Amino acid sequence: MIIGIPKEIKNNENRVALTPAGAKELVKRGHTVYVQHTAGENSGFPDSAYETVGAKILPSINDVYQTAEMIVKVKEPIAVEYPLVRKGQLVFTYFHFASDEKLTLAMMDSGSVCLAYETVENPDGTLPLLIPMSEVAGRMSIQEGARFLEKPQGGKGILLGGVPGVKPARVLVLGGGIVGYNAALMAAGMGADASSCTSSLVSEKMSRCSCGTSSILTCLPCSWVGA
């Protein structure tokens, strides 16, 4: 199969859909991999890293879409990419169609075959391609929260982990799924007193988790928390 990796052009998206290691595996299995010029640059992968493992570099996003049978991306195509998607072309990325009617209609009109990462399921119902995104979201939420506790950001000047003589902040995470678990784990790892309010089965793992010397993740079953 001819696989194309375009450069992500959605605002603030710096990731690339395929690493050189991934490209190497695909080439080894007989596929042809085309990567747009500088597609991996913002993730620390120069064009030369792809060329070394047998991938080929194309100069523009148009070239990638026109050449590839399957497009592999990180985020959904934005409006300027809609006309580039061809009938019968496979597009593999995070789509989140439910929140974007224009994208949904554009992909239907294109006649392409869309494979959404977030809907890929294991036999047990878990979502293996959504879990990494949820892990990142949970951990980033605590970093962002800690930043907005700072005085220059309009916060109260609270240091999440405290210092000798000053108690650490108390963090309550509502929900104990993948996002909530990683948020609580991150908060505890930064020295905060972290608790989770959840009825999720993931909470079993949380209740056994501790970070550092005093920050312990506590499971509080709270079925009364409404949706």
What are these model-predicted stretches?
Residues E25, M70, L103-A106, M140-F148, ...:
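Alpha-helical scaffold segments in soluble metabolic enzymes
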Residues I2, E8, P77-R170:
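Glycine/serine-rich phosphate-binding loop and adjoining beta1-alpha1 elements at the start
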Residues C197, C209-C211, C219-C222:
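Cysteine-centered motifs
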Residues P6-N42, P152-S207, A227:
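Glycine-rich phosphate/diphosphate-binding loop of Rossmann-like nucleotide-binding domains
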Residues L58-M70, G138-K151, A227:
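Short, basic, helix/turn surface patches
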Residues S203-E204, S214-I216:
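Intrinsic low-complexity, disordered N-terminal segments enriched in polar/charged/small residues
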Residues K28-T32, A55-K56, M70-K73, D109-V113, ...:
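Generic secondary-structure signature for well-ordered alpha-helical cores
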Residues I2-A106:
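An N-terminal-biased, well-structured beta-alpha scaffold segment characteristic
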